[in-house]
Amino acid sequence: MHIFTHLQNRIYKFLYRRKCKRLGLTFPLLCKAHGVKNADAQGAIAQSKAGDRLQLVHVSKENYPNNVYVYSIPLNRVLGYLDERLSQKLVKLFKKGFCIDGAIENVTGENHAVRGCNLRIFDTRVMMSDVHDFSHLHGA
C-alpha cells in the first residue's frame, strides 16, 4: 500500500471516530423503528424475524430532510423509519443519501395489536453496496 494512501486512511479513521464521539454515536447502535402502526408496516413486521438484514436509507422528503427509512432486504419492504434525532446524527456522520447496514434485533408486541421491532445499526455499507437508486422501495 502506498504510504500516502495509508496515511489518508489513518486520518480518515481518526476523524470518523472523533465525529462519532462528538455526535454520541457508538456502533452498533440499538434503537427501534418508528411509524410502524400502518397496515403495510405491520404486515412486513409480522413476516420479519430476529437477524433479518436491513438497510437504513436516507431519503429526504419535503418536510423531513433527515428522513431515514428502515428497509427489509428479505421482504423488499419498508418497515418504518428512524426517529428524527437519530436520523439527524446519522446524516451528519454519513452525509445525505447514505445507505448503511442493520439487522432486526427482535420483534416486539407479538401478542398485542401493534407489533414493533428493535434494530441494530452498523456503520458498514456492504449489504447493498451496488445499489444507488432507492426509488423502487415498496412503501417509501
Q: How would you label these PLM feature ranges?
A:
Residues 1-140:
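Conserved active-site motif detector
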